């Protein structure tokens, strides 16, 4: 029997998008054989999300999450293929987890990197190109550094790229694929909106001189 190493588990996970524990169990059950482990996961419905990705997901639900203190709220639309699945516990649990994820990640503004407008990417590039630590560097080196920084920044803005708040060993995209595999339907995060109490409202603070005067008189 082949040794079930972390590298082997990661390789299976990369090929199937299944969870780490599922991959480890599959490898143990199949004595480390990669092909048999992939087939085992497919039979269990864990590694089948990719095959379903081309099917239309027009059903689903809009979920909400209000954070403790009622200062942050999220609305998120999650799509699937049938109304039956949309009403199920797995789908509803995913909907709530994703809504919580958006509430916990204030820098996230888009579902995926692909949705980020080119104008935003260009603006980020402009900002990075102007940073002091790049001055004097050759253009080729500067371009590589900027490309890496922009890629990281754009990922920070995309929901699917975020580490899952309940299990940082996977990201949100992998979580969606895992649930899709278990459910047996294509699942797609379509859009979300975050509301922050008081956002955009200019609060007029007390006049400092008047505050000092009142304290002195008191």
Swiss-Prot record:
CDD domains recorded: UBA_EF-Ts
UniProt similarity note: Belongs to the EF-Ts family.
UniProt xrefs under InterPro entries: EF-Ts_dimer_sf (IPR036402), Transl_elong_EFTs/EF1B (IPR001816), Transl_elong_EFTs/EF1B_dimer (IPR014039), Transl_elong_Ts_CS (IPR018101), UBA-like_sf (IPR009060)
Lineage of the organism: Bacteria, Bacillati, Cyanobacteriota, Cyanophyceae, Synechococcales
Record's signal peptide: none
Disulfide bonds: none
NCBIfam families: tsf
Protein name in UniProt: Elongation factor Ts
Keyword Cytoplasm attached: yes
Coiled coil (residue ranges): none
Major subcellular location class: cytoplasm
Localization annotation: Cytoplasm
GO cellular component, one term: cytoplasm
